[in-house]
């Protein structure tokens, strides 16, 4: 089972919150104290809470569930995309479009258009167009890929959201809440943990901390998927009993 230790978190700077003047009182139970005007997060809480979240994600993946990684802050985007791709899951790394979950019907149409344009770009259709028309379609393709590329093969709503930065991604969290989709989120000392089913109190800005979260979630999803494949193989008669 994928787990993260206290040492891992200390080395990544997970315990460094925001300046005390920007704190959200709802995070008080998870704050150890303050140092040089910066809140220190109590990792005695974070370690078990994150490991519980990882176990949940692994369980979702073991049942063929879809994990949607969400992190549109500049510091998070790259790690979110890399980690989601590494475990064959899905991501939003650029901008959360309002209605991405709650208006899935419309989003599905946009994904259909994205796939049409992708086909046209490789089957020679673009070459037959005027220069202006080809440029317009190329721009449309790039725009759609940027906003929907990470969910184009999701094939329906996700089974869990993994979010870096609860305050920054509050719209995504609210949409998930409206649809009853569980939310795992990293919540810093300046944020409210409202609407988050699995709270991970921790720094949501430092690259090392973000990479620790995303790589751990990817590993948990992979482990869960591995269990699913092992069960499937056994059912298909590929695994011989000793």
UniProtKB/Swiss-Prot annotation:
Highest taxon in the source lineage: Bacteria
Keywords: Ribonucleoprotein, Ribosomal protein
Matching InterPro entries: Ribosomal_uS2 (IPR001865), Ribosomal_uS2_bac/mit/plastid (IPR005706), Ribosomal_uS2_CS (IPR018130), Ribosomal_uS2_flav_dom_sf (IPR023591)
GO BP field: translation
GO cellular component: cytosolic small ribosomal subunit
GO molecular function: structural constituent of ribosome
Signal sequence interval, chain numbering: none
Sequence similarity: Belongs to the universal ribosomal protein uS2 family.
Protein name: Small ribosomal subunit protein uS2
